[in-house]
Amino acid sequence: TMTNSCEKGRSMIEMLGVLAIVGVLSVGGIAGYSKAMGKYKTNHLIEQLTMLITNIRNSFIGQHDFSDINNNLLINIGAVPADMYDHSRASNDILHAWNGKVTIFPSEASNNKQMAFELYVNNISKNVCIEMVTMDWGKDPSSGFTSLYIGTLEEDIAEPQMKDVHSSADRNEANGIYTIGTHDMAIPLTLEQAYAACTCSPVGCTIGL
């Protein structure tokens, strides 16, 4: 009888050990899945923005006036990727992979002439913000990319934020604006600079390209 009791005791301990291991594996599996999904969404967001920007440039090729550009126009001419806009909705909201809004404005960054456009992405996390602002979106002048905005606006972007940029040599990081060039805060930012710049509010960061 004593032998049987001891055997039962060891069996219970072994079972608890197995359950603990299964629990650890389950938590690890969930964490790994969440990380993988986060990476997938971020990559998809970058793909969406790249496609949208390419479509805008192709639609306005040969033109130097973006004064009429807005979400409605881009939706109507089919420049918005299919997975960023739901035609069954009445709104003109363009949504990205993290379910935040994308808003496009004509840019007043070049001597008040609207010869460019600004694209804003809201409701992204600090980690996504860091990944985006450390990317090389195009340092070559031929790319058309001149500046980057990093903010923590909790409301929808209602107007372009990069009005203070008049040339690629300007430095306006105090206003959340970063430019290409050879200065210390030139974009793309370093990892350390990005970590300091992406100070997100609870609803997330806002990025402007």
Language-model-detected regions and their locations in the chain:
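Membrane-proximal N-terminal amphipathic helix
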Residues: 31-71
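Intrinsically disordered, low-complexity regions enriched in Pro/Ser/Thr/Gly and acidic residues
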Residues: 89-209
